[in-house]
Amino acid sequence: MTSALHHIPHRTKKLPPLRVGIGGPVGSGKTTLLEMLCKAMRDKYDLVAITNDIYTKEDQRLLTVAGALPAERIMGVETGGCPHTAIREDASINLEAIDRMLEDFPDADVVFVESGGDNLAATFSPELSDLTIYVIDVAAGEKIPRKGGPGITKSDLFVINKTDLAPYVGANLDVMEQDTQRMRRQRPYVMTNLKTHTGVAEVVAFIEKRGMLTAD
């Protein structure tokens, strides 16, 4: 276990914690992105994370094994049904999880909430998330951005992950980017390859700026 896991920085200002929702289809890279964000931000901010799975706590286990944060700062929630419901129509199970985490870590700067794998219609309740990040992967097909759906068109940040797979699945990244710009208009997006950490810094910068974590 690295020393970074034992060092939790002190907050410089008292503000309600920023709640960041991370959604997207199964296998798109949500958990890997959350791991990368925790590792990139944990020395600067006080972080906690909540993961959603339907019948298991597999994502919680993966983050713990990866050393994203100390185990006590990662909570797994078993939704027992449609993952969309647990982040939108009835977010009570996640709101309760946030309350429990903040009882243990009242100085948290950021609460990450990773949804279970869902479809393009998934969105986070405003009660649950201040910022939303929606993740797709190139292997799902070049056409995904132009299919639309709230995750693609309305999320605060859209992430197109696994760009390294484009040549193997016949996806044209230029076309995906053009379709993304057309569907999202002025809303930001990032192309990522999390295996090489490509794009992670841009996602962190977005969270810091839009979440007003920095004075800049």
UniProtKB/Swiss-Prot annotation:
Print the keywords alphabetically.
Chaperone, Cytoplasm, GTP-binding, Nickel insertion, Nucleotide-binding
Q: Which Gene3D superfamilies match?
A: P-loop containing nucleotide triphosphate hydrolases
Q: What is this protein called?
A: Urease accessory protein UreG
Give the chief site where it resides: cytoplasm
Subunit: Homodimer. UreD, UreF and UreG form a complex that acts as a GTP-hydrolysis-dependent molecular chaperone, activating the urease apoprotein by helping to assemble the nickel containing metallocenter of UreC. The UreE protein probably delivers the nickel.
Q: What does this protein do?
A: Facilitates the functional incorporation of the urease nickel metallocenter. This process requires GTP hydrolysis, probably effectuated by UreG.
According to its UniProt entry, this protein's organism is: Variovorax paradoxus (strain S110)
Annotated GTP binding lies at: 24-31
Report any Pfam family annotated for this entry: cobW
Task: Name any Gene Ontology BP term.
Answer: urea catabolic process
User: What lineage, starting at the top, does this entry show?
Assistant: Bacteria, Pseudomonadati, Pseudomonadota, Betaproteobacteria, Burkholderiales
MF annotations from Gene Ontology = GTP binding; GTPase activity; nickel cation binding
The question of whether Chaperone is a record keyword is answered with yes
The compartments listed are: Cytoplasm
Q: Which HAMAP family match?
A: UreG
GO CC annotation: cytoplasm
Check the UniProt entry and state the signal peptide residues, or none. Answer: none
Query: Which family is annotated?
Result: Belongs to the SIMIBI class G3E GTPase family. UreG subfamily.
Q: Which SUPFAM superfamilies match?
A: P-loop containing nucleoside triphosphate hydrolases (SSF52540)
